[in-house]
Amino acid sequence: MRDLKTYLSVAPVISTLWFGSLAGLLIEINRFFPDALTFPFFSF
């Protein structure tokens, strides 16, 4: 039961950090390349 409580208290923190960093990354990409359908750094 203690392990379940630990998991339930850690998972929201990890997911909040993950989704927050993902949102920040997407915001920064859209700031440097607005309305881009293809990104220059993915084209080889």
Swiss-Prot record:
Q: Which InterPro entries match?
A: PSI_PsaJ, PSI_PsaJ_sf
HAMAP family in the cross-refs: PSI_PsaJ
Answer yes or no on keyword Lyase: no
Which regions span the lipid bilayer? Answer: 7-27
Q: Where in the cell is it found?
A: Plastid, Chloroplast thylakoid membrane
Gene coding for it:
psaJ
Membrane topology designation: Single-pass membrane protein
Q: Which Gene3D superfamilies match?
A: Single helix bin
Major location (coarse): plastid
Q: What is this protein called?
A: Photosystem I reaction center subunit IX
Q: Which GO terms describe its cellular component?
A: chloroplast thylakoid membrane; photosystem I
Family from the record: Belongs to the PsaJ family.
Name one matching Pfam family: PSI_PsaJ
Q: What are the recorded Gene Ontology BP terms?
A: photosynthesis
Listed A to Z, the keywords are: Chloroplast, Membrane, Photosynthesis, Photosystem I, Plastid, Thylakoid, Transmembrane, Transmembrane helix
State the protein's purpose.
May help in the organization of the PsaE and PsaF subunits.
Q: Which domain of life is it from?
A: Eukaryota
> Which source organism does the UniProt entry give?
Populus trichocarpa (Western balsam poplar)
